[in-house]
Every structure is written in C-alpha cells, then in structure tokens.
Regions:
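Phosphate/anion-contacting hairpin/loop surfaces
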Residues: 15, 41-262
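Extreme N-terminal "head/tail" segments of very large remodeling/mechanoenzyme assemblies
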Residues: 1-57
C-alpha cells in the first residue's frame, strides 16, 4: 500500500527512539530521488522522495553511489554531517516529515537545519531549510508559474501546502466520528465519502472501513442500515484512539510466501 499519513505516523513512532540524538556521519545520494543518512551506531536512514514510493525507513541495503556526488548531496554533507537529529515531526496528519538537525559550523557556532520530506506522490520533494525556514535547496525546484503561490526555490521561505478542508482523526475526533455516523448521500460510496472528508485516510483504509461496515468494499451509504452505520462510526472511533495513543499493530500480507502489501 502507499505510505499514507497514518502509516507514516506509525513509522515515525517506531523510528524516533532510534534516531533522536543520533549523529550523522555520512550523507549519500545513490539515486536521484534517494538520500541515505549514515548514523552513528551503524544505522542507515533511507529517505526516498520519488513519485512512486516516497518513504522514510531504516535499511540494511548497501546501494552503489555515483563517482561524483550530486550538488544536493554535497550541500547536505556541508550542513548535516556531524550534526545530531534532535526532533522528528509530522505536520498535522499529512505526509510531511521534518528532521531537525543541530550542528556546529566552520566558525564553531551552533545552529539548526531542517530536512523536510514531502511524501506526496508525484509532488514528492526533499528540502533543506535553515533555522529561519528559508530554503537552502531542494530535490525538485518549483517555479512560481507551476505552483501558484507556493514556489519551492533556494532563498524563499518554506511554506506548508495549503491545508485540506477535511476533518482530522487527531484534532476533531468527535466530529469525524459523528460525520461517519451520519454518512453521505444514498448513492455515494463509503470509500469516496471517507476519502473526500478525512485527513490521512488512504484508498486502502477507506475500503477496509467500508468492508467492515457493509461487507463490501464498494458499498453505498444507501445500502447501510442503522447498525452498519454505527459499526462504521465505531471503527472510526477505535482508529482515532489508536492513532492518538500511537497504538499500532503492523501487518504484512504474504502471497506464496512473498510479502505483497502491508
């Protein structure tokens, strides 16, 4: 499955105890969309900002690096090597992660830099910010005429994407559960209803909710009785509590002995 915002939150919850305080010894860029941070303690943090599988994870895979490091890699080495990761934050319930790194420059002055991963499909990006959130550089530069008000260029101040007008399981759990209970129009599918109205809900999660409520992944709200709508609301309530409390149960789907989804 794609790394949706809820799954990303779970991954970060697992990574923080291992990464907070870790010293960055090396920075590598084995591919255009990939950065690998080699951390003290023999940890390798892969940050993939590609359009197909954007993600962040620990890895044991040794990737071949180009003979000449790309410009972004050299910039990251200049600002991050020798620094320590002090914070890892997820913006709202979005697929945006900020790694805060405290380091000492050539003059012996302490400062912070931020490495921001926007794991947003074809719009995925990786940005290096200074302590004032000014962009030092990014993996994909975006001009004004392409993105409208949100350009991503060196020298500009970084801005988060415009918030989506959706309910969050974290900031408004009661409203989210009540909306799930009321539901949408009779001909609207549960999957589409959930995708259009809730932050962090991926198509796979939406179909799972629909199946648990109506025993079909493409069930429409008009086909749900009161008990099934209450089941949907309860599923939302349980999920909201689990996410807020960081209570996760990772699952891997195997087919013929090979992992095919998670």
């Amino acid at each position: 499955m794609p790394l949706d915002a809820i799954c990303l939150r779970a991954v970060l919850h697992e990574l923080r105890p291992q990464l907070i305080g870790a010293r960055i010894d090396k920075v590598q860029q084995p591919a255009r969309d990939q950065i690998v941070l080699l951390l003290r303690g023999n940890l390798r943090l892969l940050i993939n900002a590609g359009p197909n599988q954007p993600r962040v994870q620990l890895t044991e895979v040794l990737r071949e690096n180009p003979a000449e490091p790309p410009m972004l890699c050299m910039l990251l080495r200049k600002h991050l090597v020798g620094g320590r990761i002090t914070e890892i934050e997820q913006s709202r319930l979005e697929r945006i992660v900020t790694f805060t790194v405290r380091s000492v420059n050539e003059l012996g002055e302490s400062g912070t830099k931020k490495l921001v991963l926007e794991a947003m499909g074809r719009r995925s990006n990786l940005l290096l910010l200074d302590e004032d959130d000014r962009i030092l550089d990014c993996m994909r530069r975006v001009e004004f005429e392409v993105s409208g008000a949100r350009a991503l260029l060196p020298g500009l101040y970084y801005q988060l994407p415009t918030p989506l007008d959706k309910l969050s399981l974290l900031t408004d759990p009661e409203g989210a559960v009540e909306l799930a209970r009321r539901g949408g129009g009779a001909e609207e599918t549960v999957e589409r209803f959930l995708l259009d109205r809730y932050l962090g809900v991926s198509p796979l999660i939406a179909r799972e909710f629909a199946f648990r409520a109506g025993h079909e992944t493409d069930v429409r709200f008009g086909a749900l009785n009161d008990a099934q709508r209450e089941t949907l609301a309860q599923e939302f309530s349980d999920t909201s509590n689990a996410v807020k409390e960081d209570n996760y149960t990772p699952v891997i789907l195997y087919r013929d002995g090979k992992p095919v989804d998670f």
